[in-house]
Amino acid sequence: MSDNRNSQVVTQGVQRAPNRAMLRAVGFGDDDFTKPIVGLANGFSTITPCNMGIDSLATRAEASIRTAGAMPQKFGTITISDGISMGTEGMKYSLVSREVIADSIETACMGQSMDGVLAIGGCDKNMPGAMLAMARMNIPAIFVYGGTIKPGHLNGEDLTVVSAFEAVGQHSAGRISEAELTAVEKHACPGAGSCGGMYTANTMSSAFEAMGMSLMYSSTMAAEDEEKAVSAEQSAAVLVEAIHKQILPRDILTRKAFENAIAVIMAVGGSTNAVLHLLAISRAAGDSLTLDDFETIRAQVPVICDLKPSGRYVATDLHKAGGIPLVMKMLLEHGLLHGDALTITGKTIAEQLADVPSEPSPDQDVIRPWDNPMYKQGHLAILRGNLATEGAVAKITGIKNPQITGPARVFESEEACLEAILAGKIQPNDVIVVRYEGPKGGPGMREMLAPTSAIIGAGLGDSVGLITDGRFSGGTYGMVVGHVAPEAAVGGTIALVQEGDQITIDAHARKLELHVSDQELKERKEKWEQPKPLYNKGVLAKYAKLVSSSSVGAVTDLDLF
């Protein structure tokens, strides 16, 4: 079968003369109508440093597609800057943008009968949004990560944007001056690229590399380095070859690929958001990952990378130390990676890793030796209990007190919580509850980076817990539990918590318990009234109506009919 199996419906035959006339206007010649048409989903934007360097990558990829014998069609998709919208009403649109990105790529590619797609993205939701579309469409596809930002520097220390969030808490607690806060602000983000630690963007790009949907080494390259542009060119050539061979996303996005991604995420200390996104992508690919799958792999995989937010280094340091392929090779050598999983290159994971060293170099300490890990088990734990009967997600490493029981401090929004922290109203041993921030309740499941960073900045990170039906930034660490399901807006137990109730977060036992009797909870539930929707028109209203529980990925196309 020809390589233009999809696009031939608009390029071939006498009846398609009008279609070809339109294509001639955008650069097609007589010899181009039999070539495969490749969509180039370009996430370029000057909204955020994460995406501001992407257009040059798209230009390099576009030229490479032509050289490889295909016809590129570049189109734009959106981005929301999590870092800029953080702590504001705008953050409600962040997770929504994942669906908009997915829908826009699917719409453009399917509407124009494209034969394959190369997507380039940078900020957090670009990655899962693109992969959702790829899994749904099941046409040959590859993802190109825009690249990570280089660290900022101040007084001999590496900085990331999270440094600025934490500095706000330090300033409010009187631990640094306004001048020191301003200095951090000015040095935290030195140029183009996604946030530098093993936060959500770098976590998801690493996951895609592990799954075989991006090229090896591509997820940790700096955005501004020439090797990133070369990688974009190589990715384009690989995609055109995949179109020839008809290697499809669902050939790659198998259960083995998802398990490989989870193993790598655990090994590098990745973001809690990966749980939400992989659940969603697996469903789009026809698989059915559950929260229990994450817990099973967590118990087997050690954290072997010393990366921010809870560690010392950033993604560019990981790249210099051997990148994701070295992490994968170590996992493969210890039976924790499926070597027979297929990649977009047509080779298996094991074949791709054949020449990669099995152990990290002794002259670096970003990647630890297998027998000296950061932590013996993974860091993303699934907690359950009467406060989260469907489950909740917590980072359980890098905390001094894995168990806390304390009085609930209840807040109906992120803003109210942050105000209390900055005003010094939160005390050691308190358990903060931020509710009505879930997928439906927010709507949009905002990330709580501002409150958690304020807690860290105030010196309370080891003594205060925080639970929420919202999410956390990949930059968050401490005794924090998110994705609590069922959420407050649908009557989950978190909606029934009252000020002063005793709550236990037990990371080791993976328990999240509200110390209130079943009878008392029943009586509270009978009195509970579901809040009216905050929005009755527009994208947030549509999202709140359609979105599912976070325990199944907060998708918008679950059980529609």
Curated annotation (Swiss-Prot):
Domain of life: Bacteria
Active site: S473 (proton acceptor)
Pathway(s): Amino-acid biosynthesis; L-isoleucine biosynthesis; L-isoleucine from 2-oxobutanoate: step 3/4; Amino-acid biosynthesis; L-valine biosynthesis; L-valine from pyruvate: step 3/4
Pfam families: ILV_EDD_C, ILVD_EDD_N
Disulfide bonds: none
Binding locations of Mg(2+): D82, D124, K125, E447
Catalysed conversion reaction: (2R)-2,3-dihydroxy-3-methylbutanoate = 3-methyl-2-oxobutanoate + H2O; (2R,3R)-2,3-dihydroxy-3-methylpentanoate = (S)-3-methyl-2-oxopentanoate + H2O
Sites bearing N6-carboxylysine, chain numbering: K125
Keywords for the protein's UniProt record, in alphabetical order: 2Fe-2S, Amino-acid biosynthesis, Branched-chain amino acid biosynthesis, Iron, Iron-sulfur, Lyase, Magnesium, Metal-binding
One Gene Ontology term of the molecular function aspect: dihydroxy-acid dehydratase activity
Record InterPro entries: DHAD_IlvD/Edd, Dihydro-acid_dehy_C, DihydroxyA_deHydtase, DiOHA_6PGluconate_deHydtase_CS, ILV_EDD_C, ILV_EDD_N, IlvD/EDD_N
The protein's enzyme class: lyase
Cofactor-binding details, from the entry: Binds 1 [2Fe-2S] cluster per subunit. This cluster acts as a Lewis acid cofactor.
Function: Functions in the biosynthesis of branched-chain amino acids. Catalyzes the dehydration of (2R,3R)-2,3-dihydroxy-3-methylpentanoate (2,3-dihydroxy-3-methylvalerate) into 2-oxo-3-methylpentanoate (2-oxo-3-methylvalerate) and of (2R)-2,3-dihydroxy-3-methylbutanoate (2,3-dihydroxyisovalerate) into 2-oxo-3-methylbutanoate (2-oxoisovalerate), the penultimate precursor to L-isoleucine and L-valine, respectively.
HAMAP family (UniProt xref): IlvD
PANTHER family: DIHYDROXY-ACID DEHYDRATASE DAD (PTHR21000), DIHYDROXY-ACID DEHYDRATASE, MITOCHONDRIAL (PTHR21000:SF5)
Family per record: Belongs to the IlvD/Edd family.
Record-given protein name: Dihydroxy-acid dehydratase
Species assigned in the record: Acaryochloris marina (strain MBIC 11017)
Organism taxonomic ancestry: Bacteria, Bacillati, Cyanobacteriota, Cyanophyceae, Acaryochloridales
Gene: ilvD
